[in-house]
C-alpha cells in the first residue's frame, strides 16, 4: 500500500524526469522509466519505514535508526547523481511530513523556511552521494564512501540549522554553534556508523549495477557464498548491537551533549560478550564457507 502511494507520487511528477533526467547515465542499468520509478518508490517507502524503527531514542533528543538512508543511497548509486538528487529531495519532503511538529518551534516564517530547507530538504538531498564514487571505486567502497559523505553533509546541515534557527531557543545564542556541533554529533555519529556498515554489507553481497538485482559474487567463489553472506549479516548485527549499547548512554539527558559519566554507565561486559559471540560466529561461518569452497574445488578436479 505504501509503495503504491509513492509510485503515484512519482508518476505525478514525471515532468521532473522529463526536464532533468532525459538522458540516463551510461553506467546506469538500462531499465524502463516505469521500472526505475517503481524501484525508487519502493526504496523510498522502505527508507521511510526504517526511519520509524529506532535503534536508539536519546533522552535529550535525536535518534538513531536502522540505516534508513541506505535504500535511497543505493538508488542513487544505481541510477546516478541527478536521479539521486531527485530521490533524496523526495525523501526529504516525506521526512518533513513526518516531522511537521518541529515547525511549531519556529519563531518566524523565515525560521520555519530554514528548518524545512536545512533539516529536511538539503539534509537528504545529499543522499545523491551514493553515486559519487561509482566510476572510481569498487561497489562496496563506492557505496560506503558515499554513505560517509551523505552523513557528514547531513550533519553539517543540522549544525548550521542548530546554530542559526535554534539559537536562543534551547541554548544561549553565543553558545549555539558549539552546542549544535556537539548535540548533533550525539546521534549523527552512531547513525553514520550504522549507515556505513549497512551500505558496505549490501554493496558487498548484491550487485546494484546490473539491470536485474543479483548476488555479487566472483565466478570462482560461488561455492560457500551463502555462508559468507550470513557471516556479513552477523557482523552488521554485532555492530548495530554494540552501537546501541554504547551510544544510548553517552548523551547527557539534561544538557544534550556527550557525557563522560555515560562511559561508566555503558555495560562494557555485555558489549564485550556480544562482540565475542559475534566474532566467534563469524569465524565459524567463514570456516564453513572456506571448507565448502575447497571441497567444491576438489570435486571439480576429480
Segments from the language model and where they lie:
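Alpha-helical transmembrane segments and their cytosolic interface
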Residues: 10, 15, 21-42, 175-302
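Hydrophobic alpha-helical transmembrane segments
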Residues: 37-41, 70, 85-89, 113-117, ...
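Aromatic-anchored segments of alpha-helical transmembrane domains
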Residues: 44-53, 92-101, 151-159, 237-245
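Helix-capping/transition residues at the boundaries of transmembrane alpha-helices
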Residues: 76-77, 130, 134
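Membrane-helix interface motif
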Residues: 100-101, 160-170, 242-256
